[in-house]
Amino acid sequence: MTKALDGVRILDFTHVQSGPTCTQLLAWFGADVIKVERPGTGDITRGQLQDIPKVDSLYFTMLNHNKRSITLDTKNPKGKEVLTALIRSCDVLVENFGPGVLDRMGFTWDKIQEINPRMIVASIKGFGPGPYEDCKVYENVAQCTGGAASTTGFRDGPPLVTGAQIGDSGTGLHLALGIVTALYQRHHTGRGQRVTAAMQDGVLNLSRVKLRDQQRLAHGPLKEYSQFGEGIPFGDAVPRAGNDSGGGQPGRILKCKGWETDPNAYIYFIAQAPVWEKICDVIGETGWKTHPDYATPPARLKHLNDIFARIEQWTMTKTKFEAMDILNRDDIPCGPILSMKELAEDASLRATGTIVEVDHPTRGKYLSVGNPIKLSDSPTHVERSPLLGEHTDEILRDVLGFNDHQVAEIHDSGALAPPRKQAAE
């Protein structure tokens, strides 16, 4: 069966997490992703957070499935020739270098267009044009500058970053969509274009409901926030709201049976208006159905702390799974707080390919996330990440069409090996 992106070739100059997230998704959809790495060291994450000495780390392997690796010294004249040939042979170049790095390598947008007018150049940067465009950005910096951290946490505590990688992986997913869109447009125009995704922009896009609330503040308090029911005035910016739901339906994380010893014995509970009477029945507060303080959604907003305290009295008598079973029968929205251990052992996630077991030649078997997007006519088979330079000769021969003599010349030039250190005179 053919894959959705069969025939698309990606020149992957990305490293760490944001860019590799993008190119891995494209590889899962069938693109031929050629990862260009520095000879001798490769992507820095190969050696970061290693759990097994002298093998590629999980940090690297889980972001680089289904790719081929070529090592190339792009400062070497022969290396530049190979890179030029790769640009000529590929459809998309993806990079997440610091600002200006590609230009300093001698491959400006104009130069790339001269080599291959159909080339799409896709870039991840920390910021878009503006006062911070030259600043270095990592995951947590993106969360802090994109509005996520200022609105995450509790009102009386400091800003918090989320455990989800919305800055790195989130921006990588945004860029992948931009690349596919540019490929579609190229089908009609025949021309390549530049695609850029800034991490600050990506985080702000994912935090859009907070920008919504910022504008609502001009017209009065945010009544679904706990702060309103507590009688605490709002300031001029969206506050941190703990675990309050951001969708207009009051929600909280509540303790379940065993919370004293299990840090994840909790459930998220949404007091949705259409099932309010069922909630009252479940927790044994049938009088709330008609009580003026609880009968309508507007009336309940001033009493959310009391309401959820009472619901929590009930959830604490059940395990999170028992509570979920009972609540789901009445269509009451809820979800258990699942640990990474529970997710790793979830048979249904294995069955759908959301979590997969991968066999690697040096580190053995490990678990990874699979493709979260399922296409009925383009199923994803997760293949292990490449060893450093594993496909160098294969790419030189099969992609670029170099003969044995040319390949030997490239090897002899030092373009595929770590640069030699000059001895001090």
Swiss-Prot record:
Its EC number is 2.8.3.16. Involved in the catabolism of oxalate and in the adapatation to low pH via the induction of the oxalate-dependent acid tolerance response (ATR). Catalyzes the transfer of the CoA moiety from formyl-CoA to oxalate. CoA binds at residues 17-18, 38, 72-75, 96-98, 104, 136-139. Homodimer. Pathway: Metabolic intermediate degradation; oxalate degradation; CO(2) and formate from oxalate: step 1/2. This is Formyl-CoA:oxalate CoA-transferase. It comes from the Bacteria. Substrate binds at residues 247-249. Keywords: Transferase. Belongs to the CoA-transferase III family. Frc subfamily. One of its GO terms (biological process) is oxalate catabolic process. The keyword Transferase applies. The keyword Transferase applies. The active site is at residue 168. It catalyses: formyl-CoA + oxalate = oxalyl-CoA + formate. GO terms for molecular function: formyl-CoA transferase activity.
